[in-house]
Amino acid sequence: MKKKIVEYEVGEQVDVFLLIKTATKGLASNGKPFLTVILQDPSGDIEAKLWDVSPEVEKQYVAETIVKVAGDILNYKGRIQLRVKQIRVANENEVTDISDFVEKAPIKKEDMVEKITQYIFEMRNPNIQRLTRHLLNKHQNEFLEYPAAMKNHHEFVSGLAYHVVSMLDLAKAISALYPSLDKDLLYAGVILHDLGKVFELSGPISTTYTLEGNLLGHISIMVNEIGKAAEELQIDAEEVLILQHIVLSHHGKAEWGSPKPPLVKEAEILHYIDNLDAKMNMMDRALGRTKPGEYTERVFALDNRSFYKPTFHN
């Protein structure tokens, strides 16, 4: 079986086809331009540098371009990189489709839809159920395709839906332990909290922020979407305001992007569930690339820590 990019170890030679996920221009200390490219295949991605690039080269190596790369793997300041020795744009007859190079959620879309639909079916509050079903149906196609973020966690095709499914299972388990929680509110908050990402992000491949995403952000976008849905469904009840608050506060603090802190119980729990699932995804993916007895590369979003994989963990 062909080796995946995350399976290569430091010092190994690489000669593979990869997809350029992003390409960012920089200026070296000698004043010459270079490109930082993130290269990917279905297993994940790796950073590489292209030095002394000309304007012509910059135009060649852009996001969503499939390239043939030869080089070796190195560890630079705790991060795994691909040192490029040769690179060229792939010919049409050498590769099939971009979708063959992107990482995808480990659960099928239809299975995720079925699971989320069941959680909505279990809701007993008609206002919460109608609002949630309406908004999910309205944006379902994008919801099932988009990543949950540009980087850090669930940044792969269908990552948004996968994040939500994992959070719903966490919400169910926590609600069983703490029956005073309003399951309808918590489930709806989980499903809707990041739905604004379908406006904030450009799409599932070579993801960037849209103009709306840069100027408004997914939180305020979703608060407005809930308000519009309530008008369309002629729902004038406190549930609308509480759902808006849950979405508005799910980052927890102003410095993390929420204008208000959680002020209802379900909003507080949603914040912790969201944080837990995001961090578990980051740790699992980093440790999945690591041998027992070794440390992961540094995980920037987790305080730039390297995590140890015990020798008794395979």
UniProtKB/Swiss-Prot annotation:
EC number annotated for this UniProt entry: 3.1.-.-
Record-given protein name: 3'-5' exoribonuclease YhaM
Domain HD stretches: 163-279
NCBIfam families, per the entry: PRK13480.1
Signal sequence interval, chain numbering: none
Top-tier EC class: hydrolase
CDD domains hit by this protein: HDc (cd00077), YhaM_OBF_like (cd04492)
Gene: yhaM
